[in-house]
Amino acid sequence: MVVSVEVCLIKTLDSNILREVGTLSRAVNSINDIKYKELKLQKGQFTFLTRICENPGINLVELSNMLKVDKATTTKAIQKLIKAGYVDKKQDKFDKRGYNLTPTDKSLGVYELIIEEENRSIEICFDNFTDEEKQVVTKLLEKMSKNVENEWFKVKR
């Protein structure tokens, strides 16, 4: 009896960088989601909230582009933030079809806490890094983000 063994070639990744970045992002976001639950912020909403606090008057399209998410995701998150009293939505003065998003006093109050926590996460991520290593990693990730941003805009259309 002859048994044939087929060789199965599995394609491998050229780099694990996206898996590492994804794991890092999910871990930090999971920690933050747990910590912000008491603030009545649901999964990932703190990301939208911080960008609105940092860019008062931003519209949904600009916010979606900034965060690299689709407009439906942004709309859903913003509706929840409005309902929770974190964001005000006002009709754009120049384009009556558009709306501008502004932080409320409530969101400005928690913004400081969110930034403190984000800085703490950054400190943990950079534990045992030299200042030069921190700068190099940051510059390289910014460069990678820019490369992906161009592709994201192409695919988004």
Q: What role is predicted for each listed range?
A:
Residues 1-10, 131-157:
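C-terminal regulatory/oligomerization modules of transcriptional regulators
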Residues 1-39:
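N-terminal leader segment of winged-helix/HTH proteins
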Residues 10, 37, 53, 68, ...:
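Alpha-solenoid HEAT/Armadillo repeat architecture
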Residues 22, 50-54, 115, 142:
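Short, locally clustered residues in the helix-turn-helix/winged-helix DNA-binding domain
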Residues 25, 111, 145-148:
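A structural signal for well-ordered alpha-helices, especially hydrophobic packing surfaces
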Residues 26, 30-73, 84:
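N-terminal helix-turn-helix DNA-binding core of bacterial DNA-binding proteins
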Residues 29, 79-139:
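Charged, amphipathic alpha-helical coiled-coil/dimerization segments
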